[in-house]
A protein has these predicted regions:
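Nucleic-acid endo/exonuclease domains
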Residues: 1-147
């Protein structure tokens, strides 16, 4: 059991605390830092889990990236991919849905691709989600080369 951020060895209690509250293995310092980030940005837990899932797979992503207008849950700048975790997609109103579409349109115009992932997909299919994102990144990279 080591911290996913700094590789520090974790004791039983520290490991349990981090797993119980975030679902990821973090030392006391990085656990605290993550909780401050959540408090500040209202970050969904699944965004943190996906961020570390991507990191484990060797993908360099940013958590809570400020794009000048809003904070994006996860951004992969190399291929200009923004990932938003939909926590309450089941309660999505038509107004929120059209706002999401409009946001996606604006980010496309700026060269960014936005994908929205329902939080339960991250929770139950983390490995598959990571694999699909890596596939999307490869597709985007190929398209960038083609232009
Ligand atoms: Zn750490």
């Amino acid at each position: 059991m080591t911290c996913l951020e700094c590789k520090k060895e974790l004791g039983y209690v520290d490991h349990k605390n981090a797993m119980d509250s975030l679902g990821v293995e973090l030392c006391v310092k990085h656990h605290k830092r993550m909780q401050e980030l959540i408090k500040k940005n209202d970050t969904p837990l699944e965004a943190i889990q996906l961020y570390y899932g991507l990191k484990e797979a060797g993908v360099n992503a940013m958590l809570e990236w400020w794009n000048g207008k809003k904070s994006i849950d996860i951004a992969i700048s190399r291929v200009k991919l923004n990932i938003e975790i939909d926590s309450e997609y089941d309660k999505l109103t038509e107004e929120q849905a059209i706002n999401n579409l409009e946001e996606a349109m604006h980010s496309f115009k700026n060269g960014f691709t936005t994908i929205r992932i329902p939080h339960i997909v991250v929770r139950y299919y983390l490995n598959e989600t990571v694999r699909n994102i890596i596939g999307i990144m490869e597709g985007l990279k190929a398209n960038i080369k083609a232009i």
